[in-house]
């Protein structure tokens, strides 16, 4: 595991974009595992800038997203498809047919999870998986559980996750109660993982990287992966020995 300490959010975003850029340059037809949320927005802005400057070409890149709310259509302004389109896809030359996100409008959970697992498998897996870190240690929507969930599955969101996401909706009642998410096994099968974390995650980042490996802290499983890059600011790393 390699840990890069950065000065602030802008520096963190730049270093994370460096890792992604290197992946795209060395393997133009790579499969990127993408994440949503506030943390990667700065990284995506960096990638857009590099594309617009002629330094990156996404024309052959394929992408798979970690998760999607169940029950939200693609054009809903809080769907993760909408997030990816507005924060990255529309401003780079990626082929939208090569972008993959769980279908939140598929009511049959088993059917959609099986379809998404097959999509990832058909691509040969993920070359670089980008992850954010939830306050309770979740990655994707893999919440603290008694066991590590393996493949893509439908989850009931915890109250803490609903609370964290309600700022994006009119009220907490409007936050979806379920989501489709890649499982821990799928994430761990990525050839390389990039974990990006900001200042308000110091305690959980310490627990994830230095504490016991437990499904109660889903991100702790990353300690077992052989190629993890952590990019975090000084505040996020302040509790690390």
Q: Residues of each region from the PLM?
A:
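Generic structural signal for well-ordered alpha-helical scaffold segments
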Residues: 17-25, 48, 52, 85-89, ...
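Glycine-rich N-terminal segment of FAD-binding domains in flavoprotein oxidoreductases
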Residues: 26-52
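Structural motif
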Residues: 31, 62, 127-128
